[in-house]
């Protein structure tokens, strides 16, 4: 499995997470459509928020990055949210 973590801070980050929370049904549906989807979490932080996506392979997490980027461009461009810092890698342990 492969995971990608997007950390949103700075300009527009808190507002973006307000919007994601308000439209969580739409976000859930979109992320579940990603090929090889395993798990997804949105975590609110003091500076904005973090998303964690786990897929069966890197192709899935790459697709999730594009899906997230497209959704933000289509639905939150007016927030001028700073690009997230992105970390990714192989999953060593996955518990639920």
What are these regions (language model features)?
Residues 1-52, 56-70, 77-96:
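Short S/T/G/P-rich N-terminal loop/turn motif that feeds into the first structured element of a domain
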């Amino acid at each position: 499995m492969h995971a990608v973590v997007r950390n949103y801070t700075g300009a527009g980050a808190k507002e973006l997470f307000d919007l994601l929370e308000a439209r969580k049904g739409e976000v859930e549906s979109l992320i579940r459509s990603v090929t090889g989807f395993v798990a997804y979490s949105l975590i609110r932080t003091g500076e904005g928020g973090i998303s964690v996506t786990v897929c069966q392979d890197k192709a899935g997490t790459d697709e999730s990055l594009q899906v997230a980027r497209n959704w933000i461009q289509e639905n939150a461009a007016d927030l001028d949210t700073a690009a997230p810092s992105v970390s990714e890698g192989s999953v060593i342990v996955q518990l639920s």
